[in-house]
Amino acid sequence: MTLFRGPLLAAVVALLAACAPAAWAPAEEGAIQLPPGFRMDTFASGLGAPRFMAVSPSGDLFVSVPSRGQIVALPDRDGRGKAERAIIFADGLKRPHGLAFFRGFLYVAETGAVVRFPYRPGDLTGGKPEVVVRDLPGGGGHWTRTITFGPGGKMYVSVGSSCNVCEERDPRRAAILQFEPDGSGGRLFARGIRNAVGITFHPGTGELWATDNGRDWLGDDFPPDRILVVKEGAHYGWPYCNGRRVPDPDLGRPDFCKTTALPAVEIQAHSAPLGLTFYTGGMFPAEYRGDLFVGLHGSWNRSVQTGYKIIRIPMRGGTPGVPEDFATGWLQGSQAWGRPVDVITGKDGALYVSDDRAGRIYRIAYSTR
């Protein structure tokens, strides 16, 4: 066995320290900075590592907790802005992540399958799930699977790559798949998307938008993470290209890169954009309506940490503007007390944010008082 000694050991320790997520710090909810008139409060806590959310037809908030194999319902029936209790809707699932309510069912994307639970308005506990997709590719990295439904009633599932950078053996990796709601008719919808953790449809144009996490180990500032408008049949570059058609140093194919689809928005490298939502509520000022909000989970392999915040991308006529900070303060120096994951508009018009480090769901509201 080879032992690390002297300067080599010091170098290895320094590298590992630089590549770790920001260190844990005690929660400081009051440290969050928001635009004037906005306020953030804890909606629910003690959830372990909550990830993706969905709002039921009754207005109840549901969240996945993959580490516990659970889907949790968080009703706020009295409308006071706090979950009255946390109710386990489903348990014993295999790393459930994405959630979607559609035509009398709650669909759940597990790491290797899609299941659905019968749902009636007001339900807070689920029955026996039905498996609708049995064979999503698994193994390797990027285990999350996210699900949404399009205006035409099709089901879309994002599947990340199995690696940092490689040529996949299974074409369903680093892709978005399309199915009928019953799981039939599965096919590739778009490719070359390294890890689209978040997917959603634009409420006005009907276009599919996605976050995409770029590859690692090319420095602090490259490649950028991306927001994509996902077109049917398009290829978005990975693993051959990064950013805006820049050939990869390991697997680059310059001629092919010229044919790939361009991103709609680029974000600071290693920010780790996860959930995204177009604001459709009536609580925020008019200038926020229709804008895109994105949760940046935060870097783990950058010498100076970045992310750990919520950004707003103004939308004008369906065209994205320059990203701007909306909620910051989870990162304090080199310490982070939380990591934002998903963002969603609640029935009350507030913006809800999940945090898988602090184990909380936050509620961001606006008031002129």
Model-found features: residue ranges?
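Beta-propeller domain segments
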Residues: 23-34, 144, 161-164, 171-174, ...
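Surface loop/turn motifs at the tips and blade-to-blade linkers of beta-strand repeat domains
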Residues: 42-47, 87-92, 132-139, 188-192, ...
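Asp-box/WD-like beta-propeller blade repeats and closely related beta-sheet repeat scaffolds
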Residues: 100, 112-150, 158-162, 185, ...
